């Protein structure tokens, strides 16, 4: 009998105001079978919840722990060298005026301890994104100012910087059998699939260099089909998120107020992307089979990260979980429809 290969899960990054207990209760009450808390949600005191505490809460609410995301701290780790104040929302106040070297060292220690927790929980994937390793100029994706000129080559310098700054974290991940899953995303070390494949090349095919698929950032001509087919063998995790692009508006205008922007995250059912086709794409590139083999599970998570500049966060998230549960967790075909067309 045909069975689903997915289950509905939820990302914790936008729910940082909730405790782990509250987050898992919200996930369960909304209809999720799994949850992916963020690093902030699993913090406790000066460290993290113990693996036992996480397991106990998981069992209490009947919700699987599908992974622990750590986007913000990984991003700070590879961005601190720029001296940008944009790292401050994601690190403790005592680091706001510290040197880039001290911030980077703090992030490295924090992330290694987080990897210890993930390994103890038998989790294999850490969704995240690498920071501005190539500098803010290159992160614009537009070579003005010029990316190379007299005495400088920002991309070549960035390659060396990325390899050196990420070496310890990649080694620590490999030592624990973990996959560091980069979300291909604006203003990170990889804005598109070609950028990510370049990172894999310069790290000599490092096994820990993986991808979390997220179609909501495919809004500058690279479609989800193009992006995730190019990195297909590296996709070890998956977000479900939708968006619209408001017509006639510039995608890159200098306005940080989200309701004013052209690119808008929206509830899952009504965005520009067809989420069922996205789920089929994930099956086609082998994501659920890889996740199941890594974790010894019967299904792989579709991690809802639904958000909106207009709709209440909890309402948007709950709606997204229920949409995934009802529309994307479908029984998968065991044979071609053509096989049933012949005479018996």
Segment roles from a protein language model:
Residues 1-31, 59-61, 116, 122, ...:
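Histidine-acidic metal/acid-base catalytic patches
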Residues 8-10, 36-37, 41, 180-183, ...:
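Short catalytic-loop micro-motif centered on adjacent basic/acidic residues
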Residues 17-25, 60, 79-210, 291, ...:
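Active-site acidic/histidine proton-transfer and metal-coordination neighborhood
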Residues 20-23, 45-62, 66, 71:
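Glycine-rich, positively charged N-terminal anion/phosphate-binding segment
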Residues 36, 67-69, 127, 181, ...:
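Conserved beta-strand positions in the central sheet of alpha/beta enzyme cores
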Residues 36-59, 130-137:
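Glycine-rich, proline-tolerant flexible connector loops at the mouths of alpha/beta enzymes
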Residues 43-44, 74-76, 133-135, 186-190, ...:
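Short, small-residue-enriched loops and turns at beta-alpha junctions
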Residues 68-81, 126-138, 240-251:
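Short, solvent-exposed beta-strand-terminating loops
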């Amino acid at each position: 009998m045909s069975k689903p290969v997915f289950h509905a899960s939820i990302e914790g990054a936008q729910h940082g105001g909730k405790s782990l207990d509250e987050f898992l209760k919200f996930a369960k009450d909304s209809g999720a079978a799994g949850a992916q808390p963020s690093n902030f949600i699993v913090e406790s005191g000066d460290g993290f919840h113990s693996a036992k505490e996480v397991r106990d809460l998981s069992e209490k609410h009947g919700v699987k722990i599908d992974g622990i995301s750590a986007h913000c701290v990984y991003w700070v780790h590879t961005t601190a060298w720029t001296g940008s104040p944009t790292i401050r929302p994601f690190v403790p106040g005592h680091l706001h005026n510290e040197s880039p070297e001290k911030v980077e060292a703090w992030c490295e220690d924090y992330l290694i301890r987080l990897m210890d927790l993930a390994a103890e929980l038998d989790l294999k994937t850490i969704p995240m994104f690498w920071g501005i390793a190539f500098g803010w100029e290159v992160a614009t994706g537009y070579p003005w100012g010029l990316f190379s000129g007299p005495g400088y080559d920002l991309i070549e310098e960035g390659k060396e910087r990325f390899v050196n700054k990420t070496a310890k974290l990649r080694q620590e991940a490999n030592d624990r059998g973990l996959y560091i899953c980069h979300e291909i995303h604006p203003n990170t070390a990889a804005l598109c699939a070609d950028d990510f494949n370049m990172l894999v090349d310069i790290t000599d095919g490092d096994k820990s260099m993986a991808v979390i698929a997220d179609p909501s950032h495919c809004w500058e001509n690279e479609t989800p089909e193009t992006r995730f087919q190019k990195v297909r063998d590296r996709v070890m995790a998956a977000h479900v998120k939708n968006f619209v692009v408001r017509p006639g508006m510039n995608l890159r205008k200098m306005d940080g107020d989200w309701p004013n922007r052209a690119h808008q995250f929206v509830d899952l059912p009504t965005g520009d992307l067809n989420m069922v086709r996205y789920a089929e794409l994930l099956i086609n590139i082998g994501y659920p089979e890889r996740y199941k083999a890594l974790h010894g599970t019967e299904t792989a998570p579709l991690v809802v990260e639904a958000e909106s500049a207009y709709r209440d966060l909890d309402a948007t998230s709950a709606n997204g979980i229920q949409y995934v549960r009802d529309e994307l967790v479908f029984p998968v075909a065991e044979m071609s429809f053509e096989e049933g067309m012949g005479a018996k």
